[in-house]
Design a protein with these regions (language model features):
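Rossmann-like NAD(P)(H) cofactor-binding subdomain of soluble oxidoreductases
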Residues: 51-53, 58-121
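NAD(P)+-binding Rossmann beta1-loop-alpha1 motif at the extreme N-terminus of oxidoreductases
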Residues: 1-49
Length: 121
C-alpha cells in the first residue's frame, strides 16, 4: 500500500505520536478538525518534545478521502467522530485505530467494514 495521503482523526497523545512518526515520510498528512479546534490548530500548530510543527488541518470531507485514516479519539467520542469523518473513507481507504479497549474495533468494523481495518493496539 502506497501512502500518499493520511488523515488523523484525534490529535491527542496517540494522534500526536502518529503524526510525528509520519513526518519526513513521502506522504501528505492532514489533521481532521472542525470549528474552533480547527482554527486553533491552523493558527498555533502543535509542540511535540519541544519542537513546533505547523499542521495541514482540514474539515472532514473538505478534501478527497485519504489512503489511510488513523483514528485516535477517546472512546466516548468515537461515534460522533465517525459521523464527522464519514466522508473521509473512500473505496480504497483503510482505517487504523490507535484506540485502547475492545469495543472500538467493533464500532469501526460495523461503521466502516472489518475488511478495511488495520489492527494496531
Amino acid at each position: 500500500m502506497e501512502l500518499t495521503e493520511v488523515s488523523i482523526l484525534g490529535l491527542g497523545a496517540e494522534g500526536s505520536i502518529a503524526f510525528r512518526a509520519l513526518m519526513g515520510k513521502p506522504c501528505r498528512v492532514r489533521i481532521l478538525a472542525k470549528g474552533q479546534r480547527a482554527q486553533r490548530l491552523k493558527a498555533e500548530g502543535i509542540w511535540i518534545n519541544g519542537v513546533h510543527y505547523d499542521l495541514h488541518v482540514a474539515e472532514p470531507g473538505a478534501e478527497p478521502p485519504p489512503r489511510l485514516l488513523i483514528v485516535a479519539v477517546k472512546g466516548y467520542q468515537l461515534e460522533d467522530a465517525l459521523d464527522d469523518a464519514a466522508t473521509e473513507t473512500g473505496p480504497d481507504t483503510v482505517v487504523m485505530s490507535l484506540m485502547n479497549g475492545l469495543t472500538s474495533e467493533e464500532v469501526l468494523a460495523r461503521r466502516i467494514g472489518a475488511d478495511r481495518l488495520i489492527y494496531c493496539m
